[in-house]
Amino acid sequence: LRLQLTVLANFSDHENPAVTRILFSPNDMLARGFVKDLMRENNLIVREDAMGNIFGRWEGSNQAGGVVLTGSHCDAIPLAGMYDGTLGVIGAIEAVAALQRSVSCCYCYRYLNARPLALMYCCTARFRVLPFTLSLIHPSAVHTLPPGAPIQVANEVGYGAATTREMLDAVRMAEGDVAYFVELHIEQGPLLEREGVDIGVVTAIAAPAALEVKFSGDGGHAGGQLMPDRNDAGLAGAELALAVERHVLGTGSTDTVGTTGTFEIAPGAVNSVPRDARLAIDIRDIDGPRRDGVVSAVLESAEEIAKRRKVRLVSRIVNQDPPAGSHADIVEAVAASARDLGLSTMRMVSRAYHDSLFMARVAPMGMIFIPCKNGWSHRPDEFSKPEDIANGVRVLALTLARLSEGSWPRDEL
C-alpha cells in the first residue's frame, strides 16, 4: 500500500513530497491509468462513465440487492500531500483484493460476497469550475455550470457526450443501484492522534456553505485622498472577515466553523486606496439551520458594512449543501469490525466534506477515519503511519464483508 501510494504521488505537477494533480491534467490521466491497472490486476471488472468516474466491480451472488460501493478521489489541490483521497481508492482496492484472496485456500472455503462490491475513483473536479460530483448526484446542478464547460473539459480527454444534459443522464444513479457507500479517509484533524484512538467512526458530515462577497469603492491616491473622503473596499472586506469570526463564535458551538479563505484587493498597490475587494467565505456545521443562521448573519453584516462605508456590494451564495448523517448500518458495521480486530474507536463528526457527502443523496453512506500526523492535510508533509493505514484497510475490508452479507464462517471475522 505504501509503495502504491508513493507511485501514485509521483504523478504530480510538483516534485515529491508535494502533490499537485488537477482533474483531467496529464498527471491525472496517468494516475487513472495506474489505478485501472491495479483494478484489473486484482480481477475487478473495470468501467468508466461519461463523466470520468472509474469503477472496479467484483460480482456477488445477489444481483438484486444493490452494490456495496467504496472509494474516494485522487485529484489533489496544489502543493498537497499523498494521502488525501488516494487512501480511499488504493486502500479500497487492497481491501477488496484481501477479500478475494480469502475466497479459497488449500484447506478451506472462506468468504463469498452476496451483494456485489465495487470501487469508485470519484471524478471530483474540485479545482476547476465544474462541480462534477455534485452534477453526478444531482443533475439539476447543470443549470449552475457555464454553458458547454463540462462537455468541453470532459471531451478533451475522451469522456463526455454531445450535450451536458446527455452526459449527466448517462451517469445518473438510480435509486437502489447502491446499497451502501463507505469511504476510507485520513481524518484531516488532530483528534484521533491526540486521543490515541485507532479508528474514527464517522457519524455525520458537516454541511458546507460557500459565499462570495465583492465590495467596490472609488479608490484613489494613497497620499492625495483624505481619510474622511475614502470609501475603502479593502477595509470593508477586513471588517467582514472579522464579522465571520464573530458570528461563528457567537453560536457557542465548536461544530460551527468559518473561514475567509480568499481575500483579494485591487489594484493591490502600496500607494493606492483599494478600489475592489473580493472575499470567498466557507461556513460549515453539522447543524444545517445553525449554519444557515450564520450565513444570514454574515450577509447582513456585509450589507451593514457596505452602507456604513459607502461601498457597493455584490454577494452570492455559491453553494449551501445539507449535512449528511451516516447510516446506522454502516456505523455499526465499522464499529463491530474494529472491535473484532481489537482496535479502539471514537465516534466523530467530519468537519471536512468528502465524496460521501454527495453520495448520501443517493445511498446510505458512512466513513472510516484513520489518524494523520498533527491533523495536517492539504500540505506536502501530510502523513499517516503504515500501521494506521493497515488498520483502516482491515476495518474497511471487514465492513464491506458485513454490508455485502456474504458467507464467511464466524471464526474468520
Label each residue range with its predicted role.
Residues 22-24, 259-268, 280-286, 312-331, ...:
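A short beta-alpha structural unit
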Residues 1-14, 71-72, 345-395, 403:
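Zn-dependent metallopeptidase/amidohydrolase metal-coordination segment
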Residues 203-205, 221, 225-250, 295, ...:
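His/Asp/Glu-rich mid-to-C-terminal helical/loop segments that flank catalytic regions of hydrolases
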Residues 265, 284-288, 318-320, 375-388:
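Short beta-alpha connecting loops at secondary-structure transitions
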Residues 1-80, 99:
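Acidic/His- and Gly-rich active-site-bordering loop/insert found
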